[in-house]
Swiss-Prot record:
<dbReference type="Pfam" id="PF00076">
    <property type="entry name" value="RRM_1"/>
</dbReference>
<dbReference type="GO" id="GO:0042277">
    <property type="term" value="F:peptide binding"/>
</dbReference>
<dbReference type="GO" id="GO:0016018">
    <property type="term" value="F:cyclosporin A binding"/>
</dbReference>
<dbReference type="InterPro" id="IPR000504">
    <property type="entry name" value="RRM_dom"/>
</dbReference>
<dbReference type="GO" id="GO:0003755">
    <property type="term" value="F:peptidyl-prolyl cis-trans isomerase activity"/>
</dbReference>
<dbReference type="GO" id="GO:0005634">
    <property type="term" value="C:nucleus"/>
</dbReference>
<keyword id="KW-0694">RNA-binding</keyword>
<dbReference type="InterPro" id="IPR034168">
    <property type="entry name" value="PPIE_RRM"/>
</dbReference>
<keyword id="KW-0413">Isomerase</keyword>
<dbReference type="GO" id="GO:0003677">
    <property type="term" value="F:DNA binding"/>
</dbReference>
<comment type="function">
    <text>PPIases accelerate the folding of proteins. It catalyzes the cis-trans isomerization of proline imidic peptide bonds in oligopeptides. Combines RNA-binding and PPIase activities.</text>
</comment>
<comment type="similarity">
    <text>Belongs to the cyclophilin-type PPIase family. PPIase E subfamily.</text>
</comment>
<dbReference type="InterPro" id="IPR002130">
    <property type="entry name" value="Cyclophilin-type_PPIase_dom"/>
</dbReference>
<protein>
    <recommendedName>
        <fullName>Peptidyl-prolyl cis-trans isomerase E</fullName>
        <ecNumber>5.2.1.8</ecNumber>
    </recommendedName>
</protein>
<dbReference type="InterPro" id="IPR035979">
    <property type="entry name" value="RBD_domain_sf"/>
</dbReference>
<dbReference type="Pfam" id="PF00160">
    <property type="entry name" value="Pro_isomerase"/>
</dbReference>
<dbReference type="InterPro" id="IPR020892">
    <property type="entry name" value="Cyclophilin-type_PPIase_CS"/>
</dbReference>
Length: 324
């Protein structure tokens, strides 16, 4: 989305930094549109290299939407990199014009903090080129209305067995899988759970390795909305059920195996979340009507999101059901 010529508004314009070369204005739009109407997006280019500088600007129509975006997106993960999201600093009053703030080279030098790509490498450690992680999609219907696809990148570099289980259940190559199953448990501001393709109520499902398989590791954490993790009914009871986090859920760290994150379709996740209730029973039937594998996108290797944190007490749940 091209930037329009509007004056900078410090309460509506966000600085987003630290993302990798694969991020485009379209990607930023998809990541931030869930918080409200967007006026303009711009990613300044380095005309010497022909590449962007690893940061950009997003202006919202409403100040409260901009604030919500900061609350949810600052220090979140985008294509495997931890990004920063704050209000953009305005230029001096004497420098104001009809141009957007990011069109001012002096502003970029002073407040752009150089290359956001370099910042990302510093925060994530050394970045090495990867062949690309597997990506799968879930096409979702609410009632009779198709609302779109959720695209998930699988962390086969950290949890290969868990990632392969989910990939195969998306493709159906083992003769069974997620197509036609539902999100049977949806709790707003927490998570949406699905993957029970045998019973549909949270008591069924199976993995490609047998009824259950062991917890692979807990290196990846529940740090942000869009995190995808295995549901279970205790240690080493992973099957096919999974959940997508609607918010940061760090009390689940060390109890559930994180194996991926949503890279496209968070707007679909939010629409599904709206069908939830405090009890978890969806207001309408939410089904996965199509699923499969996409071509991987070559990119810089994502960080593993390892953190040392003390898990909090998990929610009380019915023991016979797999839960988040």
């Amino acid at each position: 989305m091209a930037a329009s010529n509007f004056p900078h508004n410090k309460k509506r314009t966000l600085y987003v930094g630290g993302f990798g070369e694969e991020v485009t204005e379209k990607v930023l739009m998809a990541a931030f549109i869930t918080f409200g109407d967007i006026v303009a997006i711009s990613i300044p280019m380095d005309y010497e290299t022909g590449k962007h500088r690893g940061f950009g600007f997003v202006e919202f129509e409403l100040a409260e939407d901009a604030a919500a975006a900061i609350d949810n997106m600052n220090e979140s993960e985008l294509f495997g990199r931890t990004i920063r999201c704050n209000f953009a600093r305005p230029p001096k009053a004497t420098e104001r014009s009809s141009r957007p703030v990011w069109a001012d080279d002096e502003w970029l030098k002073r407040y752009g903090k150089g290359s956001g790509i370099a910042d990302a490498k510093e925060s994530n450690g050394s970045a090495s080129t990867a062949k690309g992680l597997p990506r799968v999609y879930l096409g979702v219907k609410i009632g009779i209305r198709y609302i779109g696809r959720i695209v998930i990148e699988l962390r086969s570099d950290v949890v290969p067995r868990t990632a392969e289980n989910f990939r195969c259940l998306c493709t159906g190559e083992k003769g069974f899988g997620y197509e036609g199953s539902s999100f049977h448990r949806i709790i707003p501001k927490f998570m949406l759970q699905g993957g029970d393709f045998t019973k549909g109520d949270g008591t069924g499902g199976k993995s490609i390795y047998g009824p259950k398989f062991e917890d692979e590791n807990f290196k990846l954490k529940h740090l942000m909305p869009g995190t995808v993790s295995m549901a279970n009914c205790g240690p080493n009871t992973n099957g096919s059920q999974f959940f997508i986090c609607a918010e940061k859920t760090d009390w689940l760290d060390g109890k559930h195996v994180v194996f991926g994150h949503v890279v496209e379709g968070m707007n679909v996740v939010r629409q599904v979340e709206q069908q939830g209730t405090p009890s978890g029973k969806p207001q309408m039937v939410v089904k996965i009507v199509e699923c499969g594998e996409l071509d991987p996108v070559p990119q810089t290797e994502p960080q593993e999101n390892e953190e040392n944190s003390d898990p909090q007490t998990p929610m009380d749940v019915e023991p016979q059901k797999e839960t988040a």
